[in-house]
Amino acid sequence: MTQKWMKTFCGYCYANCGINVLVKDGRIGRVKGDPDFPGSRGYLCPKGAAAAAVVHSGNRLQHPLLRTNGRFERISWHKALDTIATRLHEIRDRHGPETVLQLRGAPITQEIRDGFVQFMSAYGSPNYTGPSHLCSSPRRLGQELVLGNRTVADFKGTNCIVIWGANPTDSRNYAEGLIPERFFTVIPQAKKRGAKVIVIDPRQTELATSADEWVNIAVGTDMAFGLSLINVIIDQQLYDREFVEKWTVGFNLLKEHVRELTPEWAEKITEVPAGTIRHIATVYATTKPAAILDGNGLDQHPNVVQTVRVISMLAAITGNIDVSGGNVFAPKPKTAPYPTVHPQVKHLASEVIPLFPRVTAPYMIDALLTGKPYTPRALITHHTNPLLINANYRRVRQALEKLELIVVFDILPTATADLAHIILPAASDFERHGYGAWAGFDGGYVALQQKIIEPIGESRSVFDVEYELARRLGLKQHYPWTTNEEWINYKLSPLNVTFEELQRLHVIPVTPGIEYNKYSAKGFKTPSGKVELYCQKLKDHNQDPVPVFRPFAESQDLIEQYPLVGTTRRPGNYVHTRFRDVACLRKIQPEPLLRIHFRDARLRNIGDGDLAIVESPEGSISIKAMVTDEIRPGFVVVDFGWGNSWDGGPNVNILTSDQARCPLSGATPNRRFRCEITRNPVD
């Protein structure tokens, strides 16, 4: 028996924890955290520890499959690639390249982020994207409109920690250089030196139980809460006058805008007492420095971009931007530009969300169902499951079924793959080379995601597949690389780092640590060079230049029929819709749960463990109830990520709508839906 330990990093979530992998006779054996890896320093969550079970799963896709007469049959790679290339050639000639869509997964690894981007651009279609409307990108846009760039929370020297719509002990925010285990030490250490901890969340998360203040806010009302905080801070003159006068534009307009947006006004919307709002505003504004960690709980709402603008303004007017212990800019190592060619046409939602950098899936769905601005014909997906992750499942399914060609590239079967015409087996993160590049408080660094074992079955790297398709379509001249190793060399060339060096060193520092107060010399990366409390760019695009909270468009009849407000929760032991076939992870949480308050459960004769029916205007699901006091009455939480044919659980997006959208990012309200709950009579 041969065995050896090899270094790489995990690609199962944004944390990208460094790991040491024991390889026994060509198979993955034990996996443990790498104490030398800068970001994780030895920590490893259950997902990473289960790597062997994932890679060697009996459910792995191992061969190309072609749908024939309603069934999948095994075919060769040669036939699969030829078939796809022929269809793409026909579609391009008949309908134009822009009618081919591409969806990729969350950019957890660089291969997922970059996969098929060069191909789509060379082919001529601008309609490629990831789940950007659901995660991070809307928040990034909100911060960029105010501050010019994304910030991260600097907890090292802070005296006030605000966790807003985030749950970092369960779902790590990768940008902070913190992991769940270490985060458990950050809070006690901060509190020991007198720091205040504030958690703003409609659910009593683990952090909320130990916080100084848990703000039990109504779902989707964070903007109103933030505007009322600004009202108090300005009214009580708790803002940083020197910073505001020198480094902001539009303060007087903001001041006038929030004059009537008092805590009493916000209380009616947020269900947070006015006294609590005043207290939180005072604590945050007077406890310096203060850092805000925002999270995915803010993303999936129609007002997400404007909400994050408000949060950014809070940090700015209190002087907590780009200071030690506040919200700081952590520049990520700059890699080579990608793609190297660009389509000649704009993406199909460019007129609707012109400030967002890419098309989003809901507008692809619209185009498929309406034919406007044109009718898409084909879809290539890799490492994603759009049928389950997007709001309004029935509408998404109806749209996908209209496509002439669906190609799914993944390591495991998915609900989306069930609709595919061709399924291609993907190599796992342990079966091909990749790289990672991260910002860090102590400096940015790059690392090698190393090929640990040979690919299972006939699985291939995404770059192998897209290059072979490009070659068949006469596009290979657009590729500055042909292999994963050449791709790594190309992307890291501005950093003077090579694949060979990464093989030897594994981790290479490439940028210095965080610098504070950079704006004093360079200004902010906004049109004015200052923090923009009033945004002329938004005004020019007929959007609110100062954030305006608008009530939810819900009739009294709707509220009476569906009196409960629901949201979703992603269990931390899974990755979106993946890994529910992994026994050791399934043991942690074998099935999805509905969290419902004791009072609401009693009124509906629902006991803990009973099956309940959750019904919304869009549809209904049956799910086991968990009766709890960690949420407010009138509010329920449904677990997200189930719905594959083999996992035995319901898809929460049967309940959600995709019609109310953020006008700046296209974000849909996956995190808020009206519903009613009854006991399942078959229980």
What would you call each of these model-derived segments?
Residues F430-P455, A470:
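Glycine/threonine-rich phosphate-binding loop and adjacent beta-strand/alpha-helix elements that clamp
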Residues M1-Q236, W265, P273, R602, ...:
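N-terminal export/assembly segments and adjacent metallocofactor-ligating motifs
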Residues N167, S210-A211, E260-W265, L293-L298, ...:
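Flexible glycine/proline-enriched surface loops and loop-helix/loop-strand junctions
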Residues G96-T99, Y239-V244, A291, D322-F329, ...:
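Flexible, glycine/charged-enriched surface loops at secondary-structure junctions
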Residues D114-Q189, A195-I200, A224-L227, S312-D418, ...:
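Extended redox/cofactor-interaction regions of prokaryotic respiratory oxidoreductases
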Residues L229, V249-P362:
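Active-site phosphate/pyrophosphate-binding segments
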Residues K246-V249, Y284, N327-Y338, W481-L495, ...:
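A glycine-rich phosphate-binding loop feature that marks nucleotide/adenosyl-phosphate handling sites
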Residues I452, I456, R460-H506, T577-R595, ...:
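Long, contiguous, secondary-structure-rich segments that constitute the structural scaffold
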